């Protein structure tokens, strides 16, 4: 293994974070929480053009328990949480140079039969909402059925927790 490869990846991702209006003012501690586990678990995509990074995406495969933990506090995941289950969550999606469409197409092709969710934050209100994404080959009706099952499992489990702070209403 080339020892410089992880450092090179970190450099590329840090460049993208610094170039992203959403990410550039986030603390370094969030970079460590969001990026290092993704690289360690090989749960990321880094798109380059002419050897320059243009887009980055990372995801965690969470258990239901860790999904609830993440929704309650997006800074709560530790390295082992990233590979704790089969419930896929996009953690970072960064395309500051107009390559969002290319990253979207790449991810749909890379994960043709997979489902993902993400917390998307409105940059003006700083309010987050859960969004759903699916691969390019999965049937939309099947995807919706599975997402509904995920929501049912999530809501059922959240109702059992007295310390959950995430709002279940829009």
UniProtKB/Swiss-Prot annotation:
List of catalytic residues: 23, 92
GO aspect biological process, one term: toxin metabolic process
Entry EC number(s): 2.3.1.-
Post-translational modification: Proteolytically cleaved by the protease systems ClpAP, ClpXP and FtsH, leading to its degradation.
Predominant localisation class: cytoplasm
Cellular localization per UniProt: Cytoplasm
Mutagenesis or variant effect for residue 150 to G: Great loss of activity
Outcome after substituting residue 11 to A: Strongly decreased acyltransferase activity
GO cellular component, one term: cytoplasm
Record's catalysed reaction(s): tetradecanoyl-[ACP] + L-lysyl-[protein] = N(6)-tetradecanoyl-L-lysyl-[protein] + holo-[ACP] + H(+)
This protein's record includes keyword Zinc-finger: no
Positions annotated to bind heme: 151
Effect caused by changing residue 87 to A/K: Little effect
One term of GO molecular function: metal ion binding
Effect of residue 53 to A: Strongly decreased acyltransferase activity
Alphabetically ordered keywords of this record: Acyltransferase, Cytolysis, Cytoplasm, Heme, Hemolysis, Iron, Metal-binding, Plasmid, Transferase, Virulence
Function: Protein-lysine myristoyltransferase that catalyzes myristoylation of the protoxin (HlyA) at two internal lysine residues, thereby converting it to the active toxin.
Complex formation: Monomer.
Family, similarity comment: Belongs to the RTX toxin acyltransferase family.
Name listed for the protein in its UniProt record: Protein-lysine myristoyltransferase HlyC
Organism: Escherichia coli
